C-alpha cells in the first residue's frame, strides 16, 4: 500500500500531524503500537487529573461543614469506582482521538511499525504483516518511563506512574522519587 506520508506514534504530535496531513490532501497512514493519545491521554495528564478531581471532591466534602453544609459522618471513598471512572474517561477520549483521525481521512493502523529500508525513493514499513510504502515519514514516538539506576531498586516492589494509576488498594506508605525537569537542572 502506498501513502504520501506515514506517522509513527499516535500521541498528540502524531495524531495532530495525521489530521493536518490528511486535511491537506495527503494520503496518510498513522501507526500506533500501544494506545492512541500517547502518554498524556493514557498514563499522564488525563488519568491523573481525573483521579485528582475525585480527591478534590472528597476533600471538599470533608470540609463542607465549615461552609454550613451538613454531610453524614464517616465520608469514605471507593477506590475501585474511582479507578473505573478514570478508565472510562480515558477510553472515551481515546475513542474520540481515533474517530477524529479517521474523520480526516487518515488510515489508523494499531500495530507496531518497523522501518525496513528504502526502495526506489520510497520508505518501506512493515506493520502487522502488511507492507507500506511512503514518500515521507514523521516519527513521533513520544516518551516513556525511565527507571533510574539506583542500587537495590530491582530488589524491591516499586511502581512507576503507570502502576500508580492502576492501583487496586492504597499503600500504607510510599516514597516518591521524581527527577527535576531539564529547566530545573540547568539552574543548579
Show where each model-derived region lies:
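Beta1/beta-strand and adjacent pyrophosphate-binding region of the FAD-binding site
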Residues: 1-10, 172-176
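Glycine-rich flavin
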Residues: 2-3, 19-26, 31-170
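N-terminal Rossmann-fold NAD(P) dinucleotide-binding loop
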Residues: 14
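Conserved small/polar residues in nucleotide/adenosyl-binding loops
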Residues: 177-184
Amino acid at each position: 500500500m502506498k501513502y504520501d506520508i506515514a506517522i509513527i506514534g499516535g500521541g498528540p504530535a502524531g495524531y495532530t500531524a495525521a489530521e493536518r496531513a490528511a486535511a491537506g490532501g495527503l494520503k496518510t497512514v498513522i501507526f500506533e503500537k500501544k494506545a492512541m493519545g500517547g502518554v498524556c491521554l493514557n498514563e499522564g495528564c488525563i488519568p491523573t487529573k481525573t483521579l485528582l478531581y475525585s480527591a478534590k471532591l472528597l476533600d471538599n466534602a470533608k470540609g463542607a461543614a465549615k461552609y454550613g453544609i451538613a454531610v453524614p459522618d464517616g465520608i469514605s471513598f471507593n477506590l475501585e469506582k474511582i479507578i473505573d471512572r478514570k478508565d472510562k474517561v480515558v477510553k472515551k477520549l481515546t475513542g474520540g482521538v481515533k474517530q477524529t483521525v479517521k474523520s480526516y481521512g487518515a488510515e489508523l493502523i494499531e500495530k507496531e511499525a518497523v522501518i525496513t529500508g528504502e526502495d526506489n525513493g520510497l520508505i518501506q514499513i512493515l506493520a502487522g504483516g502488511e507492507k507500506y510504502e511512503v514518500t515521507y515519514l514523521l516519527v513521533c514516538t513520544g516518551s516513556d518511563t525511565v527507571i533510574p539506576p539506583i542500587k537495590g531498586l530491582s530488589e524491591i516492589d516499586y511502581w512507576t506512574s503507570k502502576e500508580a494509576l492502576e492501583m487496586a488498594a492504597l499503600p500504607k506508605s510510599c516514597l516518591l522519587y521524581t527527577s527535576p525537569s531539564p529547566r530545573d537542572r540547568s539552574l543548579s
